[in-house]
A protein has these predicted regions:
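Long, charged, low-complexity intrinsically disordered regions
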Residues: 1-96
Length: 96
């Protein structure tokens, strides 16, 4: 009998930059992914990050902004400028 394929693939490592695109994530994963991203971005010393959630119906934007409002080291957040995603992305200012 052949061994079963591992149902848990190896984790994917993503380089942490000051911009993070959530388009490839399911809404059910957004909270955990954004929390992990913010922790790593803060650890790296980023003062500002851009989280791209898309325009859509606003489900991902709402989740992102809830996480931001609950995160102690987030000073403030707002829509990205028009040239950088507008209301399809959120800019967060972090304590450094």
């Amino acid at each position: 009998m052949e061994p079963l394929e591992n149902p848990f693939p190896e984790p994917v490592e993503i380089e942490i930059t000051d911009s993070f695109d959530l388009h490839s994530f399911s809404p059910k994963d957004i909270r955990a992914v954004v929390e992990a991203y913010l922790a790593e971005a803060h650890k790296k010393g980023f003062a500002t990050v851009r989280i791209i959630h898309g325009k859509g119906v606003g489900i991902q934007r709402e989740i992102v902004r809830n996480v931001l409002s609950e995160t102690d080291f987030v000073r403030s957040f707002k829509n990205a400028p028009e040239f950088s995603g507008s209301w399809g992305a959120t800019i967060a200012i972090l304590d450094v």
